[in-house]
Amino acid sequence: FQCQDGKCISYKWICDGNTECKDGSDESLETCMSVTCKIGDFSCGGRVNRCIPESWRCDGQQDCENGSDEEGCSPKTCSQDEFRCQDGKCIAPKFVCDSDRDCLDGSDEASCPTPTCGPASFQCNSSTCIPELWACDGDPDCEDGSDEWPQHCRSHSSSLPERSNNPCSALEFHCHSGECIHSSWRCDGDTDCKDKSDEENCDVATCRPDEFQCSDGTCIHGSRQCDREYDCKDMSDEQGCVNATLCEGPNKFKCQSGECISLDKVCNSVRDCRDWSDEPLKECGTNECLDNKGGCSHICNDLKIGYECLCPEGFQLVDKHRCEDIDECQDPDACSQICVNLEGSYKCQCEEGFQLEPLTKACKAIGTIAYLFFTNRHEVRKMTLDRSEYTSLIPNLKNVVALDTEVASNRIYWSDLSQRKIYSTQIDRAPSFSSYDTIIGEDLQAPDGLAVDWIHSNIYWTDSILGTVSVADTKGVKRKTLFQEKGSKPRAIVVDPVHGFMYWTDWGTPAKIKKGGLNGVDVYSLVTEDIQWPNGITLDLSGGRLYWVDSKLHSISSIDVNGGNRKTVLEDKTKLAHPFSLAIFEDKVFWTDIINEAIFSANRLTGSDIHLMAENLLSPEDIVLFHNLTQPRGVNWCERTALQNGGCQYLCLPAPQINPRSPKFTCACPDGMLLAKDMRSCLTETEPAGTTQGPSMVNSTAVGPKHTASSELTTAESVTMSQHALGDVAGRGVTEKPQSVGALYIVLPIALLILLFFGTFLLWKNWRLKSINSINFDNPVYQKTTEDEVHICRSQDGYTYPSRQMVSLED
């Protein structure tokens, strides 16, 4: 668009409420009234006449400034198989009279009869019903734990599974509700157990006379009260403080002799300061701005004594005289997605698939409806962001904890802590138990975190008891332990298959957030400070930022993917009493809270606008957002090569894209096997020198659990063999059994003769070198005639790393 003064601006900037043309022609009434919306858009009308997608019309959220997009909308109607709450929301009929308030107004539990359970069910003391098989199995399923009460389970005592009375380590406290927490969190004034048992029977803290007692009972040094910094967790040390500092503000003047007087007493021909500094003869009545604006580049403001330089909005003073443009885009939260810096201002733009909302200036998704999927212990539920649809997706589960989806294939994956398995099914077939596929069914202890690589069709999971991070293909046929560290407690995990990285939280000692390649290499700690109990973690791919919740600090924080620009989004001991997981979409952050038994949302940039999404849940843990824009397309280099599976005999894993020269993928072998010299084939760990374990192997600080590959392994020559056959081939690489013992009598004499010949040759060569004069240099660099070079060689389908070579200093 060409402004009337000749300047050109982007056409999408006209009539957006901000003036880009200096003459204002981009926001003039004539310009805006001439705008016509394209087919599929809705015109807000009015003076601005902005266009929004038709799908935003009557969606319950005002997008036009004049609210025209929500005018004349008919009331939302629920389908025949849904229950309509009094507030107009729709929920699944199974949620009605289930003893849980699923309508925010509670209308689904009004006038409900006393529930009765079927013959194959057990009725909890709270009147809810659970399958009879879940009662007295050593795992509490009723909200009040009554299914495991001794009076109900005497007849089942012999059939109970063996369980440790205290599964926690010596450095942990065992909550009565079953969790393990750090022993240092016991009686610290902050509830960490679900049942608050960590704060029971605690001695009341008494502070010394020189200390201040916070409202939560903790003590801080008395000098920290009213020091303008929050030292108490409940911020009570800064309440009721009078932080008035003398001579601050535009109406105060500080004399050079120390007094503070009112500004109206300056230059009034009366001495108010002892040193007469309020009545300087040369400066009173002088306007320095009349002479070349006092040297100011933009605005000169005359004062009673002296003058000051000011800058227009969007500029900052750099040397008391000169103004410089402020780059607002240095703030990662200036815009929700793309920030364009302009002279004196900035513009926000959106990624493909999003459109800037006229009213809030936030990027809003276009197209399909976004859903929240979340676990509720015995089921997975599905809910739209406006709660207009709220249903049960996967019912009758034992103890579902972790969750993730693959949007393109319309599949959902989840882990069950009680079953110690990872499952998957098609979302449209989720209610059918017969459609569940067991992806990982063995060698799991506590699969707390789960993430799907939607580009390379792999799943990654954490195990907090084994202290491992593992990978498998989405069918569960091939798997490998990528990382294991003693004392670690990995929890949640998120992947970035576009760039080849994964991130996970670890609440072991010390707590941290780790980053590594999706092939297990280059693992390091990204966050190690101001972190205590990191739980859920999620990734904003478009913005390149990580978000996580800390259950001990009651906070939501963010950081860029390289560990910089850390920000605290929200701290709230009430709404973040015990946050477990979180999800990001558009400008919103959604999180589950175990103690509140609820799901909340807030603005992910400011932490404001907190809303209750769902309540009265039963241990809500993981939460994911289902929308096609959350999983952008990428290149699967393992399938782009001429060789099947990238030429890898077992797993082909994406490599981290650290720089433009980084490999696209590397091969990996199952636990207990190593890569051969070709960096594609797999050999047993007993293979002698001649094989090499290069950087494409995993980074593990301890040996992971060994898994038997139940799948067939495909070689580069497309030869298929079983795991047992693969071991036989590796064994034959170590030694071949001779056909007859008599061959030894022929081979050994020949070998001895060859050794005798080479020995004689080396003795002669040594004598010859000693008889020749040599030149010695003090600088040791001259003693090395052959340079050590390490090259990363690129083949047709990937990258390989050469084996190490010894360089002689004499040769």
From Swiss-Prot:
LDL-receptor class B repeats lie at residues 368-409, 410-456, 457-499, 500-543, 544-587, 588-629. Residues 285-324, 325-357 form the EGF-like domain. It comes from the Eukaryota. GO terms for molecular function: calcium ion binding; lipoprotein particle binding; low-density lipoprotein particle receptor activity. Residues 765-811 are cytoplasmic. Changing R84C: In FH; recessive. The keyword Oxidoreductase does not apply. The chain crosses the membrane at residues 744-764. A motif (NPXY motif) lies at residues 777-782. It is found in: Cell membrane; Membrane, Clathrin-coated pit; Golgi apparatus; Early endosome. Keywords: Cell membrane, Cholesterol metabolism, Coated pit, Disease variant, Disulfide bond, EGF-like domain, Endocytosis, Endosome, Glycoprotein, Golgi apparatus, LDL, Lipid metabolism, Lipid transport, Lipoprotein, Lysosome, Membrane, Receptor, Repeat, Steroid metabolism, Sterol metabolism, Transmembrane, Transmembrane helix, Transport, Ubl conjugation. One of its GO terms (cellular component) is low-density lipoprotein particle. Residues 692-722 are annotated as: Clustered O-linked oligosaccharides. N- and O-glycosylated. Ubiquitinated by MYLIP leading to degradation. Residues 765-811 are annotated as: Required for MYLIP-triggered down-regulation of LDLR. Residues 1-33, 36-74, 77-113, 116-154, 167-203, 206-242, 246-285 form the LDL-receptor class A domain. It is linked to Defects in LDLR are the cause of familial hypercholesterolemia (FH). Binds low density lipoprotein /LDL, the major cholesterol-carrying lipoprotein of plasma, and transports it into cells by endocytosis. In order to be internalized, the receptor-ligand complexes must first cluster into clathrin-coated pits. Forms a ternary complex with PGRMC1 and TMEM97 receptors which increases LDLR-mediated LDL internalization. Belongs to the LDLR family. The NPXY motif mediates the interaction with the clathrin adapter DAB2 and with LDLRAP1 which are involved in receptor internalization. A few residues outside the motif also play a role in the interaction. Interacts (via NPXY motif) with DAB2 (via PID domain); the interaction is impaired by tyrosine phosphorylation of the NPXY motif. Interacts (via NPXY motif) with LDLRAP1 (via PID domain). Interacts with ARRB1. Interacts with SNX17. Interacts with the full-length immature form of PCSK9 (via C-terminus). Interacts with PGRMC1 and TMEM97; the interaction increases LDL internalization. This is Low-density lipoprotein receptor. It comes from Sus scrofa.
